[in-house]
């Protein structure tokens, strides 16, 4: 029998403008320092920023399966530890304090790690391209992890829609790891329990923005309640309709959205003429965000041109985000 989920009264929602993410990993570090420094969590990055196109973290997560197909829950694959990157250490003490002459090398020898292919992208100069894709738990409206859990350990908080794993109820079945198509629940081998992003709900309860959002130096992130018509997330998703979920075909109805990137045209054709083709192939963006991305790119281009001509654009003002308080719940860190 499928687990019964009560619809939340409100839904906390995130938007990231991929045109402003600079790949600095400040959000990654903020999340890591706050939540995953315990035993068995070395390899976990509840929040990570990966280069797209690329293998991602864990490797090849986009092909692991899970989610829903025709409304039916799908079983995916549990990524092996090598796909996350086996944690490694450096023998600094031996070199600095014990007189060892060998070079300081990581042990064990790393074969994979988060951002293993950072900044590689695709294509050849001068038309090579990539962009940064920050990822976290999507706190889905239809979370596959919740339905898959055999111990009813996963629930969606009534007050904010954040999806949480009840640690006392979790028995380490890993059904959530297997069923999430975004590979965002992690199995803690020390605690024998699943861990995942908790949406910084202790901060939300105090009226403070999540750590990843508050620390974003590129001012790329927005967070708020989708029913708040004054919030930037409501405006970007519902009013201007320029923010889209990642892989909507997975069927979980994510509550993390993205403003797709605009990188401009390719540099030159072989005959020396300028190209009108976009540097990022449209098919690539459609593969990530669905067919609607074409309309969104057209809206962004129109509004950008208005702003360049000195005309007013409410949408661009929201995206620029001159005041942190307009982009999020209290930005206090």
UniProtKB/Swiss-Prot annotation:
Keywords: 3Fe-4S, 4Fe-4S, Electron transport, Iron, Iron-sulfur, Metal-binding, Periplasm, Repeat, Transport. InterPro entries: 4Fe4S_Fe-S-bd, DMSO_Rdtase_II_Fe-S_su. Pfam families: Fer4_11 (PF13247). The lineage of its organism: Bacteria, Pseudomonadati, Pseudomonadota, Betaproteobacteria, Rhodocyclales. It comes from Dechloromonas aromatica (strain RCB). [4Fe-4S] cluster 3 binds at residues 137, 140, 145, 180. Residues 12-40, 128-159, 161-190 form the 4Fe-4S ferredoxin-type domain. This is Perchlorate reductase subunit beta. PROSITE patterns: 4FE4S_FER_2. Its cofactor is [3Fe-4S] cluster; [4Fe-4S] cluster. [3Fe-4S] cluster binds at residues 149, 170, 176. Component of the perchlorate reductase that catalyzes the reduction of perchlorate to chlorite and allows anaerobic growth on perchlorate as the sole electron acceptor. The beta subunit may be responsible for electron transfer to the catalytic alpha subunit PcrA. CDD domains: EBDH_beta (cd10555). One of its GO terms (molecular function) is metal ion binding.
């Amino acid at each position: 029998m499928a687990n019964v989920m009560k619809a939340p009264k409100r839904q906390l929602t995130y938007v990231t403008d991929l045109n402003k993410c600079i790949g600095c990993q400040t959000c990654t570090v903020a999340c890591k320092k706050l939540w995953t420094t315990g035993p068995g969590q070395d390899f976990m990055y509840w929040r990570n920023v990966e280069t797209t196109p690329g293998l991602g973290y864990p490797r090849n997560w986009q092909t692991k399966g899970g989610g829903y197909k025709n409304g039916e829950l799908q079983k995916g694959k549990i990524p092996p530890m090598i796909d996350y990157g086996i944690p490694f250490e450096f023998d600094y003490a031996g070199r600095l304090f014990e007189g060892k002459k060998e070079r300081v090398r990581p042990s064990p020898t790393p074969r994979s790690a988060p951002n293993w292919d950072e900044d590689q992208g695709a294509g050849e100069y001068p038309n090579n391209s990539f962009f940064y894709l920050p990822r976290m738990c999507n706190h889905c409206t239809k979370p596959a992890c919740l339905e898959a859990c055999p111990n009813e350990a996963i629930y969606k908080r009534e007050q904010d829609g954040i999806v949480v794993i009840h640690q006392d109820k979790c028995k380490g079945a890993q059904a959530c790891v297997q069923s999430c198509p975004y590979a965002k629940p992690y199995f803690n081998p020390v605690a024998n329990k699943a861990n995942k992003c908790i949406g910084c709900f202790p901060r939300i309860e105090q009226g403070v923005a999540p750590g990843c959002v508050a620390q974003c130096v590129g001012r790329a992130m927005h967070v708020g309640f989708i029913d708040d018509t004054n919030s930037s997330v409501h405006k970007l998703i519902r009013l201007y309709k320029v923010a889209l979920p990642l892989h909507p075909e997975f069927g979980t109805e994510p509550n993390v959205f993205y403003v797709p990137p605009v990188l401009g045209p390719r540099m030159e054709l072989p005959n020396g003429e300028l190209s009108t083709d976009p540097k990022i192939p449209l098919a690539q963006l459609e593969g990530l965000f669905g067919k609607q991305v074409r309309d969104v790119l057209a809206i962004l281009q129109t509004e950008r041109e208005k702003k360049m001509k000195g005309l007013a654009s409410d949408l661009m003002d929201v995206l620029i985000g001159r005041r942190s308080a307009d982009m999020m719940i209290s930005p206090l860190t």
